[in-house]
Curated annotation (Swiss-Prot):
Gene3D superfamilies: 2.30.30.30. Belongs to the universal ribosomal protein uL24 family. This is Large ribosomal subunit protein uL24. GO terms for biological process: translation. GO terms for cellular component: large ribosomal subunit. InterPro entries: KOW, Rib_uL2_dom2, Ribosomal_uL24_CS, Ribosomal_uL24_euk/arc, Ribosomal_uL24_KOW, Translation_prot_SH3-like_sf. One of two assembly initiator proteins, it binds directly to the 5'-end of the 23S rRNA, where it nucleates assembly of the 50S subunit. Located at the polypeptide exit tunnel on the outside of the subunit. GO terms for molecular function: rRNA binding; structural constituent of ribosome. It holds the Pfam family Ribosomal_L26. CDD domains: KOW_RPL26. The gene is rpl24. PROSITE patterns: RIBOSOMAL_L24. The lineage of its organism: Archaea, Methanobacteriati, Methanobacteriota, Methanomada group, Methanococci. Keywords: Ribonucleoprotein, Ribosomal protein, RNA-binding, rRNA-binding. Part of the 50S ribosomal subunit.
Length: 119
């Protein structure tokens, strides 16, 4: 999905900032594990709440957990297990970009999500 044809970084950033919700959903895609790739014949699918993902990059590399929240405004997901400890002892979920995770197990409660496999 092309948001803009410009090469200018400022216009690329502006296109991401002003992107409609259906385009943001597509941009929130993460790669699938090997067995899911074979099963669905797709390399990547949008991340949804309830999916189990493995973090591949960053401080929390190697952690596997369930997606508890997907933030379409900031293009981030929140994974259980990737937490920051605050000064007062509380824990807060750490935001992670979906390009840095791999979907290991998908939440199959939504039938519309798998309608592409009928084609």
């Amino acid at each position: 999905m092309v948001l803009t044809t410009s090469k200018q970084p400022r216009k690329q950033r502006k296109a991401l900032y002003n992107a409609p919700l259906h385009a943001r959903n597509k941009l929130m895609s993460a790669m699938l594990s090997k067995d899911l790739k074979e099963k669905y014949n797709k390399n990547a699918l949008p991340v949804k709440t309830g999916d189990t993902v493995k973090i591949l990059r960053g401080t929390f590399k190697g952690i596997e957990g369930e997606v508890s929240k997907v933030d379409y405004k900031s293009y981030k997901i929140y994974v259980e297990g990737a937490v920051n400890r605050k000064q007062d002892g509380n824990e807060s979920l750490y935001p992670i970009h979906p390009s840095n995770v791999m979907i290991v197990k998908m939440d199959d409660s939504d039938d519309r999500r798998f309608k592409f496999s009928n084609k």
